[in-house]
């Protein structure tokens, strides 16, 4: 999550810096992407998602759910992926491509276990924030992609609700996904966004495409049309 820098002189903000900040906001909106943690007013960083650090886990390698809830503990096993710096990286430019994604163990909103591990089939992880306008725009496209039979039959899709805030629109995320008619499995991220940080998600919606053995094929963030989703998956997964 990017922290805003405010310049001050004689108790007033610099007009030039206000203009720069306004331009930055416009560019983010045009890009169709919400910055990770955009629902918060406080800046934060992810020290564990620099690509060279190990995601920490409890001594027994597991986490226990406290029952039903909008936030659930997440255990990640493996190295965190580097933070995605571009919304749509050129093929081969994402340092995470070709590396093993960490295995995520967590729970759904009801407290039922959910494990995101290799299944032998390609998997698409979709990181969503309930307050994100781009996520709200993208979910209907993903559903259209599925219902129009353009999505590869072998592709498994899992939604991960993250960056949740009870002071933001569409709270709670569990009801939001019901209202949006989300048809796939769901993992609820922790309040610390452990799942998102482990996968190096830099914006919402964040998409992480994995091969059947858990290898990262491609990542992207921001809105995508059905045709763009088709092209993106086909380029990363030729057999799709």
What are the functions of these language-model segments?
Residues 113-136, 142:
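Short active-site neighborhood of thiol/selenol oxidoreductases, capturing the structured segment around
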Residues 1-100:
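N-terminal targeting signals for export/organelle localization
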Residues 121-122, 137-161, 226-228, 234-235:
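Conserved helix-turn-beta segment immediately C-terminal to the redox Cys motif
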Residues 174-213:
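Short, internal strand/loop/helix patches
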Residues 95-96, 103-123:
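A short beta-strand-turn-helix
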Residues 129-134, 163-167, 191-194, 202, ...:
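Solvent-exposed loop/turn segments at secondary-structure junctions
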Residues 152-170, 182-191:
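Thiol-based oxidoreductase modules, predominantly thioredoxin-like and allied folds used
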Residues 121, 150, 203-240:
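Thiol-/selenol-based redox modules, centered on thioredoxin-like
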């Amino acid at each position: 999550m990017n922290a805003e820098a405010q310049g001050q002189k004689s108790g007033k903000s610099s007009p030039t810096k206000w203009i720069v900040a306004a331009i930055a906001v416009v560019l983010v909106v045009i890009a169709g992407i919400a910055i990770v943690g955009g629902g918060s007013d406080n800046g934060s960083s992810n020290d564990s998602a620099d690509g060279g650090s190990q995601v920490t886990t409890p001594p027994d390698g597991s986490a226990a759910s406290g029952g039903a809830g909008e936030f659930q503990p997440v255990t990640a096993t493996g190295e965190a992926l580097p933070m995605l710096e571009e919304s749509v990286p050129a093929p081969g430019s994402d340092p995470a491509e070709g590396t093993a994604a960490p295995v995520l163990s967590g729970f759904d909103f009801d407290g039922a276990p959910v494990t995101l591990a290799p299944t032998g089939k390609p998997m698409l992880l979709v990181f969503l924030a309930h307050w994100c306008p781009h996520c709200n725009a993208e979910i209907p496209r993903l559903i259209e992609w599925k219902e129009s039979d353009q999505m590869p039959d072998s592709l498994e899709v899992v939604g991960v609700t993250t960056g949740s805030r009870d002071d933001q629109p569409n709270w709670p995320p569990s009801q939001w996904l019901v209202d949006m008619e989300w048809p796939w499995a769901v993992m609820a991220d922790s309040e610390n966004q452990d799942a998102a940080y482990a996968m190096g998600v830099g914006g919402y919606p964040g998409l992480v495409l994995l091969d059947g053995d858990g290898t990262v094929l491609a990542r992207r963030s921001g809105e995508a049309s059905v045709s763009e989703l088709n092209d993106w998956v086909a380029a990363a997964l030729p057999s799709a």
